[in-house]
Amino acid sequence: MYQVGVDIGGTNIAMGLVDETLDVVQRRSMPFEVEGGGERTAEIIYEGVLAMLKEQGAGTADLDSVGVVVPGSIDPAGSVIINAYNLNFHNEPLKAKIKKHFGDIPVFLANDADGAALAELHKGAFVGCRTAVLFTLGTGVGGGLILGGRMFHGGLGNGCELGHALLVSGGEPCTCGNKGCIEAYCSATAIIRDAVRAMEKHPESLLFERTMGKAERMNAKTAIDCAKEGDSAALEVFNNFVDHLGSAVASMINLLDCERVAIGGGVSAAGEFLFEPLRKNVHEKSFFENHGSVVPAVMGNDAGIIGAAMLRRNEE
């Protein structure tokens, strides 16, 4: 039997046919048609699944479930996308629209960051863990929580918004409208903001040279690369970033006594340049002497597909 995993993004719908060993044996990537709404999205998913099954020499009778993850909030019943701004979905009953095509085959719907944590649990950095936390650091900060060996949906079913836990009271403004959120300090966007400020303050810096003093040329990789090369302005930005991320990670360890915290997303590509000082920072701030480890997330681009495919297993 196969599980289908579908990862809906702002530009593409990635889907895969996942076998019992959690290998993705067939893949499809199809454009997301924002103007088509939920009806067209359900059709695209069905068409893609049929194509994958045909390629695999299988049929719908060989399907065990269809799992879908989206970058947005899901209602407690796991049926309606409350808000997914990048998709222009608001109170969208996507599960029911997909189910119309698949009949008796179970369909599951979840947030994409929660799905990524589930993928790490079944095939990645969290294998064997009962309690673990995933931070995904990109334009924003997402995250997922594993409690008792299962994806945590929240007490009221609203999920886990790690990026919007408060880190600095009255601090930097966040996209959510609050101030001082983890996302406002630990995202690629935060690195860019602080690097631009440092560049403008230090025209002699490598940050200034690499961007020709233009804010629009700054990105997180440039800032981190300058820090790796020893630029003092960039190092100050990077060290502040590590300090804030260390506080966020240590807080989760102190709260949950989790076995493992994984860091994913584009910023994690900095490798040991990030993880070595981060582990030291977390150790200094952890209440427990014997605390959980801090590791890179490993699922990469397959996190959405594998996590979506594992949604049924999470409910068993």
Q: For each predicted feature, which ranges?
A:
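Proteins enriched for Cys/Gly/acidic motifs involved in redox and nucleic-acid/cofactor modification
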Residues: 116
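Short beta-strand segments
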Residues: 7, 67-71, 110, 134-140, ...
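Hydrophobic "anchor" residues
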Residues: 24, 80-81, 151-152
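ATP-binding/phosphotransfer module of carbohydrate and carboxylate kinases, centering on a glycine-rich
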Residues: 1-65, 75-78, 96-107, 119-129, ...
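A charged helix-plus-loop insertion that forms the helical arch/lid used to bind
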Residues: 79-90
